């Protein structure tokens, strides 16, 4: 071999080695980037899911103790909870997502001082809206009687509703504070506090009902004690100096620009309410099918399974919202796309796992709620539809979270309205009463609505110009931003700026 050939061969080997090293570096960089994104996602999603599951657990604790105290009380509590309280819970959850959008984008844009202002504005707006809807809770009994509900049950509702008013007002603070802390990656404390509040709720409820014999009032007292204990603990955390960059005290600026905040909050609340009420309407419709008792029992059990899984997925919704809002605030459209891909992949994989578990154990799980073999068979018959619903449920909330993070609540609300109520429910009615498919027909209609909603949201997000969304976010931050009067004199803020 000539010297020239040896040199060419050596150069080829060196080029190949360099290319291999470059590919290896790119692979390591990608793995590091994915792991970093997954870590950020779980830091948000895990405490958020825990908060939602413990909040739902508080409702279950009250229901369980009331059920052991009075069957009539259980029926009244379930009726009030599944109608007016569920509506307000969905409304507060939706309106608080406006706080999540604004605080997330402000945190990404490093406008930390505005986050506390947004939180205060959300308290004002949510308090006003809750007070506006309060007469519906006060008049829940008469309204339900006008709708033809059992008189004896609705009279018990009249005795229960005063206990629910403090609980509803506690939601204003717990939900908005959760979004505020979540936007700045401090929501681990929310998971801890929500777990402790559930434990306190359980202890107080047990003491009031089992030891003091307070019955329904004792169960609802425990619910309020647990809820407000969490609110007070969150106040201590925020006001006590654990959020030095984002909470600088109460400000008169909170009363400025309330109309834009109200518009965003209402569109957010409308978006979530449509989803919360969808399942409730289907449960009510199940009562008019053949073998209504079995149908309602089976559908309710499936609803419990669906709701537990939904609470986990809503944690991913929060993660998607915060990550998208943060990166939009930073002005990084590429990072937005990357975050969406990672969160969607993880959530879909979890959906596949949950769906498989549902298919394998759904019939057995039903025995946790009922000893009836007929109910178990009915639940097992619905397991395939439930599994598909769970799979779609692992995708749709992420897409909604992305839309919320970008401030597209109004668009999602319209999509939800069209998918659920213009397509899903009418189709379910046709399958039930025309084709006589019973509960399976109802759920199939719901499934069609969710599938259509998912497809539309996928298309909207796929076609979204994220560079344009970055510009819109920057413009929104300029319009809504407030210059901190003490920025130059505040060593904490100066230190935060240097670290960035």
UniProtKB/Swiss-Prot annotation:
Protein localization: Membrane
GO biological process: xenobiotic detoxification by transmembrane export across the plasma membrane
Transmembrane segments: 48-67, 72-92, 124-144, 160-180, 188-208, 225-245, 266-286, 298-318, 342-362, 384-404, 411-431, 441-461
Region (Disordered), start-end ranges: 1-20
GO molecular function terms attached to this record: antiporter activity; xenobiotic transmembrane transporter activity
Disulfide bonds: none
Leader sequence segment: none
Pfam families named in the record: MatE (PF01554)
Keywords per UniProt: Membrane, Transmembrane, Transmembrane helix, Transport
Membrane topology: Multi-pass membrane protein
Main location: membrane
GO cellular component, one term: membrane
Family: Belongs to the multi antimicrobial extrusion (MATE) (TC 2.A.66.1) family.
Protein name according to UniProt: Protein DETOXIFICATION 24
Species assigned in the record: Arabidopsis thaliana (Mouse-ear cress)
Organism phylogeny: Eukaryota, Viridiplantae, Streptophyta, Embryophyta, Tracheophyta
Gene for this chain: DTX24
């Amino acid at each position: 071999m000539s010297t020239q050939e040896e040199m060419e061969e050596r150069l080829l080997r060196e080029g190949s080695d360099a290319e291999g090293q470059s590919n290896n570096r790119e692979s390591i960089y990608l793995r590091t980037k994915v792991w970093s994104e997954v870590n950020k996602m779980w830091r948000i999603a895990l405490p958020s899911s825990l908060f939602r599951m413990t909040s739902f657990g508080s409702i279950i604790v009250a229901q369980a103790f009331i059920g052991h105290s009075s069957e009539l009380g259980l029926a009244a509590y379930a009726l009030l909870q599944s109608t007016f309280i569920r509506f307000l819970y969905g409304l507060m959850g939706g309106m608080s997502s406006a706080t999540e959008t604004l605080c997330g984008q402000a945190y990404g844009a490093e406008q930390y001082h505005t986050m506390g202002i947004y939180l205060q504005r959300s308290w004002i707006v949510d308090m006003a809206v809750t007070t506006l809807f309060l007469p519906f809770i006060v008049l829940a009994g008469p309204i339900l009687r006008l709708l033809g509900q059992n008189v004896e049950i609705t009279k018990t509702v009249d005795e229960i509703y005063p206990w629910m008013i403090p609980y509803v007002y506690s939601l204003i603070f717990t939900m908005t504070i959760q979004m505020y802390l979540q936007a700045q990656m401090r929501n681990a404390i929310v998971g801890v506090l929500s777990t402790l509040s559930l434990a306190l709720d359980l202890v107080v409820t047990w003491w009031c009902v089992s030891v003091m014999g307070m019955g329904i009032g004792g169960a609802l007292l425990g619910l309020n004690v647990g809820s407000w204990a969490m609110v007070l603990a969150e106040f201590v955390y925020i006001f006590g100096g654990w959020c030095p960059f984002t909470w600088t005290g109460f400000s008169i600026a909170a009363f400025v620009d309330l109309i834009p905040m109200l518009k965003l909050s209402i569109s957010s609340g409308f978006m979530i309410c449509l989803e919360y009420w969808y399942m409730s309407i289907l449960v009510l419709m199940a009562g008019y099918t053949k073998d209504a008792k079995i149908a309602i029992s089976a559908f309710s059990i499936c609803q419990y399974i669906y709701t537990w899984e939904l609470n986990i997925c809503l944690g991913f919704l929060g993660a998607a919202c915060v990550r998208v809002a943060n990166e939009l605030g930073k002005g990084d459209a590429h990072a937005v796309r990357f975050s969406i891909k990672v969160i969607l992949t993880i959530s879909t994989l979890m959906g596949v796992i949950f769906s498989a578990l549902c298919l394998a154990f759904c019939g057995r799980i039903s025995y946790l709620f009922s000893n009836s073999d007929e109910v178990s068979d009915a639940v097992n018959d619905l397991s395939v539809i439930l599994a598909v619903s769970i799979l779609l449920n692992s995708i749709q909330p992420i897409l909604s979270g992305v839309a919320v993070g970008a401030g597209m609540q109004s668009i999602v609300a319209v999509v939800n309205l069209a998918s659920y109520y213009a397509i899903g429910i009418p189709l379910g009615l046709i399958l039930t009463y025309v084709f006589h498919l019973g509960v399976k027909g109802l759920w199939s209609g719901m499934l069609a609505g969710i599938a259509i909603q998912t497809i539309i949201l996928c298309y909207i997000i796929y076609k979204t110009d994220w560079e344009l969304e970055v510009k819109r976010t920057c413009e929104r931050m300029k319009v809504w931003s407030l210059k901190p009067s003490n920025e130059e004199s505040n060593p904490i803020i100066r230190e935060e700026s240097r670290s960035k």
